[in-house]
């Protein structure tokens, strides 16, 4: 699992007025909660961009002037019009205890259905899994080679050692859809058999 270090400054003032003042200075108000006490702090918005605007998932190391806390992003709030990050909630990670995190999905292989004209569609870009920090991969690699036209891979079909899926088992991960070209190829194949 990838790690990212962010410098965090503890907040001394709280409330809407203090949060707006922090945003004007290029800082983003944040909370850290979980086991232990809740901590309110600010992080530089430019540093936070490397975490927010990427498909990757990270274990974040929050550096409070030498004291490091490990965490994952739980929730991010954006401004409704501008793409400005307003607030981030972090959840504390403790070594030896499982953590739930959304991991990106990467498809590998060339599906059989695509070879005859079907179209591969990725339905879920990220899946929520639960596992120990040392067992978490950077991404979930799904082999689509055996997929035929009209077939779907569901979360319940996937198995990764040391990971438990939090995303419901009935959630579709990817599918090979029927296209006009594949329908035409199937019809031609049927006529050839007669």
Task: List the predicted regions and their residue ranges.
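Acidic, negatively charged sequence tracts
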Residues: 1-194
